[in-house]
Design a protein with these regions (language model features):
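Extracellular/lumen-exposed scaffold segments
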Residues: 6, 10-190
Length: 190
């Protein structure tokens, strides 16, 4: 899978690193397209006027205590930046619908860069090159969650990928894209 993005100011950054990361993410898009039948339902991909993204769930079969990762690889279009956490605007985020069977962990974000939005003379945290957000969830992490899992054969994981994008002159309206995965539950025979 693609690596997290490097930005100027990141230790070890070399000019051109963004192109390497972008190529890796583009290759991941192609690999996801080839593997779609094999992992049917585990990949959500979409293009908007601002970005391309692929959202992947790591497991199709889970049992109590299984920790899964939701990874979203995002490629902003040329001249576009996406707000990062720590700004007063709609930052890129994975938001999951509450589910009595899941424990949601803290998301992992790459380091953003500081961007001067000249029309407002405002410094904001953004992603302007390819980046990845990872959110882990655990199925049946507590006794109550395991009891709920025993009543089911399938587990739906639903939510949204939310973001707000801008170019050098315009901040576009926030976008919320639905995400949904259905995983099969494996119950222990003990």
């Amino acid at each position: 899978m693609p690596k997290a993005t490097c930005s100027r100011g990141t230790p070890g950054y070399k000019p051109g690193d963004e192109r390497v990361v972008e190529r890796e993410i583009q290759e991941a898009f192609a690999a996801h397209a080839r593997d779609r039948e094999r992992v049917e339902g585990m990949v959500v991909s979409q293009e908007t006027r601002h970005i391309q993204f692929v959202a992947t769930l790591s497991h199709a079969l889970v049992g109590p205590g299984t920790r899964m990762s939701i990874a979203i690889d995002v490629v902003p279009r040329g001249g576009i930046h996406v707000y990062a956490p720590g700004t007063p605007y709609r930052a890129a985020a994975i938001t999951l619908r509450p589910n009595p069977c899941l424990r949601v962990h803290t998301p992992v974000y790459p380091k953003p860069s500081v961007h001067l939005f000249e029309p407002l003379n405002e410094q904001v945290l953004v992603y302007s090159s390819p980046f990845r957000i990872v959110l882990d969830v655990t199925a049946g992490d507590t006794d109550a969650q395991r009891a709920e899992l025993r009543t089911r054969s399938w587990l739906d994981i639903e939510g949204t990928f939310d973001y707000q994008a801008c170019d050098s002159a315009v901040c576009y309206l926030p976008v919320s894209i639905p995400l949904k995965w259905t995983v099969k539950l494996q119950h222990s025979s003990v």
